[in-house]
Regions:
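Alpha-helical structural elements
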Residues: 11-13, 20, 49, 57
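A ubiquitous, low-specificity "background" feature that marks scattered single residues
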Residues: 10, 19, 27-29, 64, ...
């Protein structure tokens, strides 16, 4: 705890403290240093009790993973897209497996774009193959890596929304083994938030350990892996999952878990670009902010201090 000597008008209010570990500024209505320290420690302890911890879980390429599992295939090794081919090649792909994304194919592209990209990849593979010839094809990422003479192929799976809902319900029931329904916020068919503040003492686990245990149980029972974010509020949990987790290596099960609090968010993401990577910041908002010279979350924070009218 550090005592700051501030201008007289502020000091008249009492003794001013900054608690470095908790990042809390406190002005106390006491006049003695001893009583101020006691009071500060009490306030910090109460603040800790009020601090929440949230986990955000996103099932990895959910629709595509379900289709892989139903075909007895590994979702992390199979090239597959979920799209209704009957609607022409301009139909939007609802999901793309991670292995196919690794070739530069977007997760929500149109089917003709996927086919064009695959043609480009196969042209490059043909050029590099022995005798400039491709012999056969494969949908397996591992096989394609080890056998350069094979052409990249992929499966087009028609969407089955009712079936995905059944899978989602099964996974939600796994969540309920660990967290009460009132502490779960269902964000979409493949994504949830959990307030896990009160469960650490119950399970004797950290937030990361609890997230990993839940994800591995889902993987064991359904074959579907996930990414998780941990934060001190919903926004930070979501951003940890959407932004930070994408930049860390997955483990052997394809799991990525990232954490953020207010301090690490400021330290690591205030200069991150583009703004559209952040939850609820679309292209429209981003373009309006850019018109005012605002390009990062740090810019937004600084602008908020000096331009309240905005």
């Amino acid at each position: 705890i550090r005592l700051y000597f501030l201008p007289r008008p502020v000091r008249r209010q009492g003794i001013f403290f900054y608690h470095k570990d908790e990042n809390i500024f406190i002005i106390l209505q006491t006049r003695t240093l001893k009583s101020a320290i006691i009071e500060t420690k009490t306030i910090v302890k109460e603040e800790k009790k009020l601090q929440r911890t949230y986990i955000s879980i996103d099932l990895k390429s959910f629709y595509a993973s379900v289709e892989c599992r139903e075909r007895g295939l590994d979702p992390l090794d199979t090239n597959l897209v979920v799209a209704d081919e009957r609607r022409t090649d301009k139909t939007i792909c609802l999901a793309v497996t991670p292995s196919l994304k690794s070739y530069g194919i977007p997760g929500r592209g149109r089917l003709f774009e996927v086919k064009q990209r695959v043609q480009q990849i196969n042209a490059a593979r043909r050029f590099a193959a022995p005798g400039r010839q491709l012999c056969g094809s494969s949908c397996s990422y591992a096989q394609l890596q080890s056998e350069p003479q094979l052409a990249l192929d992929f499966i087009i799976a028609p969407p089955r929304m009712a079936y995905y809902m059944e899978y989602s319900t099964r996974i939600y029931e796994i969540y309920l083994r660990y967290v009460a329904p009132e502490d779960i916020i269902v964000y979409s068919v493949d994504e949830v938030f959990m307030d896990v503040t009160q469960y650490f003492e119950l399970y004797g686990l950290t937030a990361r350990e609890l997230a990993m245990r839940i994800i591995l149980e889902v993987l064991r029972e359904t074959g579907i892996t996930a990414t998780a974010g941990i934060g001190t509020n919903l926004f930070l949990a979501k951003v940890a999952m959407d932004v930070r987790a994408k930049h860390i290596a997955a483990d052997a099960n394809g799991v990525r878990i990232a954490e953020l609090d207010e301090q690490s968010y400021r330290r690591e993401l205030w200069q991150h670009r583009p703004l559209t990577d952040f939850w609820r910041v679309g292209r429209g908002y981003a373009s309006k902010l850019e018109a005012r010279g605002i390009y990062t979350m740090g810019d937004i924070a600084r602008c908020s201090v000096y331009n309240e009218e905005l």
